[in-house]
Swiss-Prot record:
Transmembrane spans: 29-49, 66-86, 109-129, 153-173, 180-200, 228-248
Domain-level remarks: Aquaporins contain two tandem repeats each containing three membrane-spanning domains and a pore-forming loop with the signature motif Asn-Pro-Ala (NPA).
Domain of life the protein comes from: Eukaryota
InterPro entries assigned to the protein according to its UniProt record, in alphabetical order: Aquaporin-like, Aquaporin_transptr, MIP, MIP_CS
Record-linked Gene3D superfamilies: Glycerol uptake facilitator protein
Name the record gives this protein: Aquaporin TIP3-2
Organism per entry: Zea mays
Pfam families on file: MIP (PF00230)
Motif (NPA 2): 208-210
One GO location term (cellular component): vacuolar membrane
Protein purpose: Aquaporins facilitate the transport of water and small neutral solutes across cell membranes.
Name of the gene: TIP3-2
Amino acid sequence: MSTATGVRAGRRFTVGRSEDATHPDTIRAAISEFIATAIFVFAAEGSVLSLGKMYHDHSTISTAGGLVAVALAHALGLAVAVAVAVNVSGGHVNPAVTFGALVGGRVSLVRAVLYWAAQLLGAVAATLLLRLATGGARPPGFALASGVGDGHAVLLEAVMTFGFVYAYYATVVDPKRGHLGTIAPLAVGFLLGANVLAGGPFDGAGMNPARVFGPALVGWRWRHHWVYWLGPFLGAGLAGLVYEYLLIPPADAVPHTHQPLAPEDY
């Protein structure tokens, strides 16, 4: 089921129509994702560069104080990014969230592809602006800690992203979310920050392929990059399927009327 504005019921994978790509609502949603992702990545990656500038060593993020500072920047940055985009695009701000919504039938493939393009471009634009504004500072990006293998990192990314997308579904997508939708940006932001505290020392806690892609491209750091795509997509896809098919009753699969801070068009 869909409407002219792109509101979709879940539980049915849909490719979408070619004209959907040029629909004004789709274009507005893609622009929203571009800007929101840029806001988030600028704050998140900027916090890492800031610590490196203060202490002349990016390894300071491995200290307790540095880790808390970076986690806080991620949490606040994402909360704001989701808040400013959720009523326009659903506030995905993350290709993995879009993938979870895709497998759950909440967005068409056409819209998902446009979201992915907008998110990646937003991340690259934010990282380029950071490099220009900081006098050419090379973004540190993401890397695996000593002793952490590719398989460990994929599992860690999958688990963290599963929880993140599950929280997104519960606070943004679930038709019975009620007033819980008003705290959706804070809920997902806090969980992101908590996961950075939990996973940061091991693999940087990506959970967002766009967040990883921007610094990787601008800083040209590609080692283990595939880990930060495979893990989040596995976790997000599983979260979308679990919440959509096990926790949302069939009768509630059709989106209800608009509520504050909950998207009418995602």
